[in-house]
Regions:
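Short, low-complexity N-terminal intrinsically disordered segments enriched in polar/charged residues
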Residues: 19-67
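Short, solvent-exposed helix-to-loop capping segments enriched in aromatics
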Residues: 89-135
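Sec/Tat-exported extracytoplasmic proteins
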Residues: 42-52, 73-77, 118-122
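Exposed beta-sheet edge and beta->alpha loop/turn motif
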Residues: 127-210
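Short, well-ordered alpha-helical segments enriched in acidic and aromatic residues
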Residues: 55-87
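Intrinsically disordered, low-complexity coil segments
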Residues: 52-53, 78-81, 85-92, 96-104, ...
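Short, flexible coil/linker elements and helix-boundary hinge sites characteristic
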Residues: 14-15, 74, 120, 138
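Bacterial Sec-dependent N-terminal signal peptides
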Residues: 1-24
Length: 210
């Protein structure tokens, strides 16, 4: 719980590291921060799941966690601008979350809709647990000037009870796309370059082999 509270306080912050280009050492550091950012997202889920039927304070806190969770994603749950291969400005669709129903993958849902629906689940009790450490399965690679991407995977368990009976008991491997962008800001001491980490789509994957 202490970790969740700390993550809530720091939710609006993104990891920054001064750099001109990503070196191997910086890649290792950034990938560790990537795993920590995914852990932060995962830590919010148990505090959101099934809270709509709980006391008022729990519901209000869950809504704050939803907002904090969206801050970790590119576009913060909304469409976001990008430049295509021809140099044209485009709008990319908002990030999505894919879940399963008793082991069958569902159609991906907008993250901005998934989190409130997680809160509104009509079960007596809901548990969302991470069953493994987050693992980088595709290391940072350059996709355009000043932009890198990576993917990471983790196992997640979802359980739901109704009338005291366990009615859903799923365990899925999830893959998270992550973007690392070079940013430049002006300070009184001159320009400063840093790397911003943002999460992308989360999909069901079968690529869990160590």
């Amino acid at each position: 719980m202490k970790r969740i509270i700390l993550a809530f306080i720091l939710c609006s912050l993104t990891f920054m590291v001064q750099a001109q280009e990503i070196t191997e050492s910086e890649k290792a550091t950034l990938e560790q921060r990537v795993k920590e950012q995914i852990d932060d997202f995962i830590s919010y889920l148990p505090e959101i799941a099934g809270k709509s039927g709980k006391p008022y304070k729990e519901k209000v806190l869950a809504q704050k966690y939803i907002k904090s969770a969206l801050e970790l994603f590119i576009g913060k749950g909304d469409q976001y601008p990008y430049i295509d291969q021809n140099g044209n400005k485009r709008l990319h669709e908002a990030v999505k979350m894919q879940t399963t129903s008793r082991g069958v993958p569902n159609r991906p849902k907008l993250m901005k809709r998934y989190l409130p629906s997680l809160m509104n689940l009509p079960y007596q009790k809901v548990e969302v647990d991470k069953c493994s450490a987050v693992r980088i399965n595709k290391h940072l690679y350059k996709i355009s000037e000043g932009r890198y991407a990576a993917t990471a995977v983790y196992l997640q368990a979802f359980r739901a009870w109704r009338d005291g009976r366990l009615i859903i008991d799923d365990k899925d491997a999830k893959q998270v796309t992550v973007y690392v962008d070079k940013k430049v800001i002006e300070t009184p001491n001159g320009s400063k370059t840093f790397w911003e980490i943002q999460l992308g789509d989360i999909r069901i994957t079968s690529d869990w082999g160590e």
